[in-house]
């Protein structure tokens, strides 16, 4: 059975977030502000249906999807690009591949111990974030 990612999660650490944002083409001022933020994730999981909210004082982002079903994702509030996304389970990792203007883009969420891990990747840049349950 896949992992249960449900809960409210607070950011503990972030590695190479600026490199990831640079690969997305996010402007200098936004990158500098975003690096200072400590976003909170709220994940609602009902079987293979997910709602993931990422909330910060700068921007909020909401995505809803069902595992195994391709969907159009509007990354308004992030890099303002649209892409076609497909989320699948790879063992206990929830993995998303995003096809669009940027190459080799996507993310993975998984739990180790009492922490939620997020790895975001785009055009060779990888950002690793760790969250603690609130």
Swiss-Prot record:
ATP-binding found in the keyword field: no
Keyword annotations: Cytoplasm, Retinol-binding, Transport, Vitamin A
Gene3D superfamilies xrefs: 2.40.128.20
PROSITE patterns the record matches: FABP
Gene Ontology CC terms, in alphabetical order: cytoplasm
The keyword Cytoplasm appears for this protein: yes
Localization, UniProt: Cytoplasm
Signal peptide start and end residues: none
Top-rank taxon: Eukaryota
Annotated tissue distribution: Highly expressed in white adipose tissue and mammary gland.
SUPFAM superfamilies named in the record: Lipocalins (SSF50814)
Molecular-function GO terms, alphabetical: retinal binding; retinoid binding; retinol binding
Notes concerning its domains: Forms a beta-barrel structure that accommodates hydrophobic ligands in its interior.
Family in the record: Belongs to the calycin superfamily. Fatty-acid binding protein (FABP) family.
PANTHER family given in the database record: FATTY ACID BINDING PROTEIN
Function: Intracellular transport of retinol.
Protein's name in the database: Retinoid-binding protein 7
